[in-house]
Amino acid sequence: MITVSVCMIVRDEEAVIRRCLSCVRSFADEIIVVDTGSKDQTASVCKEMGAKVYDLPWQDDFAAARNYAFSKAACDYQFWLDADDVISEADQEKMKELKETLDESVSVVMMRYEMQHAEHESPVVFERERCCGKRIILMERK
């Protein structure tokens, strides 16, 4: 069975981080949180929920911060999320199944990503951005 590190970069996310971390605890083998300068209790909440928290001064470079998070991950695959992301119970079960069945020769798994939407609007679904991959390194386009 594969192992999964959930990697996040955060700043002042105390209001939403607990909800996000609650969603990933069922399948994450480790949770890596890189805090880029929170003034609230984000880091404390993350530690309380079992995450490994690293401080990194913000350098105006998302790729550098995300790559730093990936460098701290020890598992086979890295899965990145934003602090306001929520994973449904059904998708949590799919992640558990994926961990048990994924052929280890697979390098990257792309997942559907539904953006938040108002009740009267249709959701926007992307085949992007929520990857689970082996030692992923991101590069921002400039």
Regions found by a protein language model. Give the residues of each.
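Extreme N-terminal starter segment of soluble prokaryotic enzymes
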Residues: 1-5
